[in-house]
Amino acid sequence: MYTYMEYLQKCFYKSTNWNEDNIFSNITASSSAILDFPIPTGFKLDSSNKSTEYSASSFTLSNYHSINGSLAYLYSSVPLRNTMGTKEISLQDALVGFRIIEPSSNNHKQLSSSKRHDRSSLLYGRMYFPGSALEAMIIKRISAHTQLLIKCINNPHMDKNGTMIVYLQKNAPKYSREFIYSTNESLIGFRCLYNLGNSDNSLNTALIPKFDNSVISIGTELWYAARTMSPGLSTAFRYSTRSTSTGKPLTMTLAVNPILGHLSSTYTVKTSVASTFSSRYDFNFFSYASNLSLGFELYNYSRENPVHSFANRSVNLSSEENRFLSHQDRKVRGQHGGNTIPIRSHTSIAQKDHSNMIINPIQNLDNYYHINPTLLPEKKKLLDEVELAAHLSSENSESVTTAFQNLVNESDFASVVKFSTSLNDRMVKILWEGRVKDFLVSTGVKVGMNPVTNAPEFNRFGVSFSYAC
């Protein structure tokens, strides 16, 4: 679950059209949210208030080992009008979960409209007590695609009483780059992420299929600690797409660290509107050690607003949501009825005489090869019908994916249960998060096997209450 300050930071990014999914550090965010979720420790109470559209404050109190707490303030030069308190906020926005990766062509329009936020900034500070530990963060937008991020920590128990990390980030639709410097070990780093694929919509959709819902990203990071002369290197690959028949998204990642010999692959899929499954396989090709991690999250619908999202929608599969998604093609075709050319089946098109057609290595929908069919007058009508069929197929695919995403966004969930296990670590984590009255509550437990007695034991247990208005 996001803290209120983290939630406001995400609202700031959304208001200024900053795409977090295009940053290398978030390339495995979906699988990490399902497999590596944290368990609360002890008792924690978080009370927050947004006094104006530009400022907010937060007070946190916990009893882990001893009574301690913190006081935080946040200021944004951009009005955060799209924020809500814990009573009204949807769980999809308040909880860390599966991320639907948007194609770069879709993000291009959003980023191009952020010029009015070129000089926006966000200031954040937190003071911990008892003690004198401080933390601060500054986000300064330099241009529509570039920002400066500074994080500072002051703690008397740290070397030189603290540390500072500076990020210079450039986030463009097709790529992102980061230059990083940390005073700890004089660490210098560079990260980059590139999105592959052609976002040009001017291509002939009748001859070349569209994959607007698929995103392929390749990134790498380089590190060098000048004080200890230690290098670091890792690279990662991410493939995110959506099913053209149901609109359900999935994400696959592959990360490699050649210096440490570590390889990690993940597969995360949203199996339904209310459920997500994720798996991860880790392998070290130096020690041949391996580990398999499995996890899932399952949302529970609110009793006040049960699954009514499908009641007024014309949707015979395994669930109501699938019945809706399976009838998108019928709905789209109904919108074109009467005003378009009658569409014949692909079988009837294939029965046409193709003896006069010119062969070319571009295959059309009727399994024949064509080259510039407009030059063939007797095939002009056939071409129009094929193009119309391709247009309807593409529109149907877009409507299905959009419909599924709308169902996820509009569903009223009351709680979520997360489960994660690791075979090699021999542990189980269970987390429940939901709304109780006006509070957001998070409670969970981590159970592992004692390596000496080989008996199960509770490693961590806690409950957290969060209130914001």
Swiss-Prot record:
<comment type="subunit">
    <text>Component of the ER-mitochondria encounter structure (ERMES) or MDM complex, composed of MMM1, MDM10, MDM12 and MDM34. Associates with the mitochondrial outer membrane sorting assembly machinery SAM(core) complex.</text>
</comment>
<dbReference type="GO" id="GO:0051654">
    <property type="term" value="P:establishment of mitochondrion localization"/>
</dbReference>
<protein>
    <recommendedName>
        <fullName>Mitochondrial distribution and morphology protein 10</fullName>
    </recommendedName>
</protein>
<dbReference type="GO" id="GO:0032865">
    <property type="term" value="C:ERMES complex"/>
</dbReference>
<dbReference type="GO" id="GO:0070096">
    <property type="term" value="P:mitochondrial outer membrane translocase complex assembly"/>
</dbReference>
<dbReference type="InterPro" id="IPR027539">
    <property type="entry name" value="Mdm10"/>
</dbReference>
<comment type="function">
    <text>Component of the ERMES/MDM complex, which serves as a molecular tether to connect the endoplasmic reticulum and mitochondria. Components of this complex are involved in the control of mitochondrial shape and protein biogenesis and may function in phospholipid exchange. MDM10 is involved in the late assembly steps of the general translocase of the mitochondrial outer membrane (TOM complex). Functions in the TOM40-specific route of the assembly of outer membrane beta-barrel proteins, including the association of TOM40 with the receptor TOM22 and small TOM proteins.</text>
</comment>
<dbReference type="GO" id="GO:0045040">
    <property type="term" value="P:protein insertion into mitochondrial outer membrane"/>
</dbReference>
<keyword id="KW-1000">Mitochondrion outer membrane</keyword>
<keyword id="KW-0812">Transmembrane</keyword>
<dbReference type="GO" id="GO:0015914">
    <property type="term" value="P:phospholipid transport"/>
</dbReference>
<keyword id="KW-0472">Membrane</keyword>
<keyword id="KW-0496">Mitochondrion</keyword>
<dbReference type="Pfam" id="PF12519">
    <property type="entry name" value="MDM10"/>
</dbReference>
<dbReference type="GO" id="GO:0001401">
    <property type="term" value="C:SAM complex"/>
</dbReference>
<dbReference type="GO" id="GO:1990456">
    <property type="term" value="P:mitochondrion-endoplasmic reticulum membrane tethering"/>
</dbReference>
<comment type="similarity">
    <text>Belongs to the MDM10 family.</text>
</comment>
<keyword id="KW-1134">Transmembrane beta strand</keyword>
<dbReference type="GO" id="GO:0000002">
    <property type="term" value="P:mitochondrial genome maintenance"/>
</dbReference>
